[in-house]
Amino acid sequence: MTALGAATASSTEEISTGLNKFAAIAETVGLSYEYAASALATVTATTRQSADIVGTAFKTLFARIQDLELGKTLDDGTTLGKYSAALNTIGVNIKDDNDNLKEMDQILEEMAEKWQTLNKDEQTALAQTVAGTRQYTQLVALMENWDFMR
């Protein structure tokens, strides 16, 4: 984690604080610790938002997919069908061949592969569906800096 902090101008303490915000939920949706730490450091470094703010945004992002998997309709009216349809329009299927939700790191990886083929309006609409209107800018920052994250 020290190397990650040095590479992103974020302190180990800052990264740890941000990870504490969303690590438990990230694990439940299939995001590895390494992916979580790298995503947090990337967005913190590129936006200069605090790790606390970015960690909260990621917690919301991952809670959305978890709630949808449980069959809930989100406050903004998003359902699993709408979420899935938004990603399907760019060729990303959130379910595997057995109709189970894919791991979040795989969904993000597939989304990142398609991101640059979208225009800005499409990127914004997709990010708002996936992350919600209050937290979508952090997802945009992650997608825009995906090569740095990897």
Where are these regions (language model features)?
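Amphipathic alpha-helical interface segments used for oligomerization, scaffolding
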Residues: M1-M149
